[in-house]
Amino acid sequence: VFSLLVFLFSCGKKEAEKVEKLPAEDKKTETTETVKKERIISITGVGDIMLGSNYPSNSLLPPNNSNILKDVESELKNSDITFGNLEGTLFDSGGTPKTCANPSVCYVFRTPSTFGKYLADSGFDVMSIANNHNGDFGAIGRQKTKENLDSLGIKYAGLAGTNESVIFEKDGVKYGFAAFAPNNGTVSINDIEHAKEVVKNLKAN
């Protein structure tokens, strides 16, 4: 479960075109009129993304480590910004798997780092890591996931105290994202006052 907040700091950016007018009969000066056009920004938002897990077994990976996003890649890339919720961790080995009260319904996801390329190839610009699986392998899993996303140039938000929001520029437009969830280690969706501060800080920048 997660919630997304996005700001387009420059969504009202104007592009100007100059149109020349003929001088009036009684004037010898030219006047220039500016015609302003609004720039339309398109954003594609994707829900839970889990490309496969090598934990507890490689049998949970797709056949031949195939890219399950391939068939929708062109659609995902057909936007100014593509956002998704990374449901799990992104690293190869290690970490401490979480324990569950009921092991029969315990889901723990560790997607191999090489699968991160599928996210980049599909045009993902920013990911929410605020969800119930970002802590599946504890602090090590979170840190390794961040490092792998950094190496791919994919931004992220949603971790309490460290990466609560993110601001970045693309094609001359400045974007701000925040992500919230009701889970440990994430920016709490239930702490309204803190959420207001996160939003306030985004708007101030």
PLM-predicted stretches and their roles:
Residues 12-205:
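Acidic, metal/ion-coordinating pockets
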Residues 1-6:
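Sec-dependent N-terminal signal peptides
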Residues 8-10:
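C-terminal motif of bacterial Sec signal peptides marking the signal peptidase cleavage site
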